[in-house]
Amino acid sequence: MASQTNKELFVGGLARILKEQRQVDVRLKAGDSDQKGVSISAHKLVLSARSEVFKMILETEEIKATTTLDTITLSELKHTELVALVE
């Protein structure tokens, strides 16, 4: 049986904590999500590492200064697009 590499273990661990909604620190809401509570939980660190746009959004003073779970609305995205982006 082949053993997993450190990279595979790390990526698998990240996927697991996202799926289990553990230690999330931001919620994302699409522009077409007009219902309250329709948001996607995510991790700021992962979003920032994968996207320069998210990095810029998450480094604004408004987001950095808050101590609560932020919800960021991305009005130009549809919910299905946002789900695909986060996964």
Curated annotation (Swiss-Prot):
Keyword annotations: Ubl conjugation pathway
Pfam families: BTB
Described purpose of this protein according to its UniProt entry: May act as a substrate-specific adapter of an E3 ubiquitin-protein ligase complex (CUL3-RBX1-BTB) which mediates the ubiquitination and subsequent proteasomal degradation of target proteins.
Pathway: Protein modification; protein ubiquitination
Name used for this protein in its record: Putative BTB/POZ domain-containing protein At3g29740
Entry-linked CDD domains: BTB_POZ_ZBTB_KLHL-like
Record remark on domains: The BTB/POZ domain mediates the interaction with some component of ubiquitin ligase complexes.
Entries under Gene3D superfamilies matching the protein: Potassium Channel Kv1.1, Chain A (3.30.710.10)
Domain BTB, first and last residues per copy: 24-87
Signal peptide (UniProt feature, chain positions): none
One BP term from GO: protein ubiquitination
UniProt feature coiled coil, ranges: none
Entry annotated with the keyword Repeat: no
